Amino acid sequence: DALLWEKDFRASHLGTMDMTFRDFMDVYAAEIKPRIREHSWIDKEYIINDEITPFFGDMRMNEIKPVDVVRWQNELIQYRNKDGEPYSPTYLRTINNQLAAIFNHPERYYDLPNNPVSKTTRMGSSKGSEMVFWTKEEYLKFSEAIMDKPLAFHAFEILYWTGIREGELLALTSADFDLDTAELSITKSYQCLRGVDTITDPKTPKSVRTISIPRFLNEEMREYLELRDDLKPHDRIFQMTKHFLSHEMKRGCEASGVKRIRIHDLRHSHVSLLINIGFSALAIAERVGHESVDITYRYAHLFPTKQKEMANALHELREE
């Protein structure tokens, strides 16, 4: 045991791939954690600790083979929780991507000769289940059912009519609203990290943006903020948890009879609303803080087809 400990100690300090997977995770954490957002590391760490290390922990990095990866994948594919439900295809893909990222690191920086993940097929799927969203009529029925709680009502009004992310909503202060120009500045995001309220940078550089809000929403927020005399300019308006929003979503759906969707689906609902009105992918992307190519890819089935118009235009051009 003493000789084995010395071997592991020397491997981890020299950065050789004769170390165990568990020891390499300490090296990986030290080198990756400073380079990514804190909540991204927490998500990554959760998957590593719960889904990856229990299987690979005592194996040596240079001895892990593609067949080991396949056996690990099969365990996760066959997993069922206490209700008999499997992991979703998108979660399986996320776990697989984390293992791939782990092995890409020593392959790139520590000359790991064989990357076992690159030789296997990926499990899961990058495409989630069918996109679900509310029409305007469904949202109005829902919002009427939660009007008795002004904090929840105004939170959902902003989510549906602006399409901002949940974390962006929870970080909003009254200073972010310019009620004279009816504009809202998105410059930060809220996360609860290890039980601590934390304000972080938005998800991507594109996420920093100023968006115009409809006049009715501007007036709703003007009236609401006037009532909230407890707030200072830089206090968070919506001092609530994500659980509170989910609970209010459930309550409103049960009271109104509207189908249940996720909080994030309100963002999809906003995008589909703008597509139906006739706005372009580029204009929508600027509003919601996405790349226009992402909007085109994710919502392509919602955009009206121009194929007939193209064919007719080509016919007329040929006949000239």
Which ranges hold each PLM region?
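N-terminal core-binding DNA-recognition domain of tyrosine site-specific recombinases/integrases
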Residues: 30-113, 128, 150, 239-243, ...
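Active-site/catalytic core of tyrosine-dependent DNA strand-transfer enzymes
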Residues: 136-140, 189-192, 214-259
